[in-house]
């Protein structure tokens, strides 16, 4: 197995993606428990450092994956109209507080004149690669769009992400239910209002 062949679930078999130092994470979590006044050796917490290390290995698996590893399958389908995958569930981790944000991504593109497309599941995998790392939603949205532009060379790309951030829900301003919406448009979607509006109508279910 190479460092880029890690898949979600491998941690259950004791494997971890390249760059994840699980023993170091365990030591750090133990120190955090001590720092907040807890006893890391009591029942209920004694296995917590190891559990957190395994969870982090899964949550941050995208750090050792590259978009070219999933956008490898390209078909010559002679399809030149929009391709859109809606409601791709995503879970990520806010890099400011290391708490989750979650929601959905909508990813669309217009193939180039050669009609090259990729598998629909590849779009979901691409979202996962960038979601499974310390992130901010704005960068996540742009990274997905830029990766598609680079790998597929389509006429245009649109990515819209809607997410709820627990750093706003469970702490700070404490506004549960508030959602953040970000978008990234490239090529034809940036240049043509009509094309962009068509995509947004499809995303919002108006067509």
UniProtKB/Swiss-Prot annotation:
Keyword match Repressor: no
Coiled coil region boundaries: none
Catalysed transformations (reactions): GTP + H2O = 7,8-dihydroneopterin 3'-triphosphate + formate + H(+)
Top-level taxon of origin: Bacteria
EC number: 3.5.4.16
Alphabetized GO MF terms: GTP binding; GTP cyclohydrolase I activity; zinc ion binding
Entry GO CC: cytoplasm
UniProt KW keywords: GTP-binding, Hydrolase, Metal-binding, Nucleotide-binding, One-carbon metabolism, Zinc
InterPro entries tied to this protein: GTP-CH-I_C/QueF (IPR043133), GTP-CH-I_N (IPR043134), GTP_CycHdrlase_I (IPR001474), GTP_CycHdrlase_I_CS (IPR018234), GTP_CycHdrlase_I_dom (IPR020602)
Gene Ontology terms: biological process: one-carbon metabolic process; tetrahydrobiopterin biosynthetic process; tetrahydrofolate biosynthetic process
Pathway: Cofactor biosynthesis; 7,8-dihydroneopterin triphosphate biosynthesis; 7,8-dihydroneopterin triphosphate from GTP: step 1/1
Residues that hold Zn(2+) according to the record: 94, 97, 167
Record note on quaternary structure: Toroid-shaped homodecamer, composed of two pentamers of five dimers.
Entry-linked PANTHER family: GTP CYCLOHYDROLASE 1, GTP CYCLOHYDROLASE I
HAMAP family assigned to the protein according to its UniProt record, in alphabetical order: FolE
Family: Belongs to the GTP cyclohydrolase I family.
Name this polypeptide is given: GTP cyclohydrolase 1
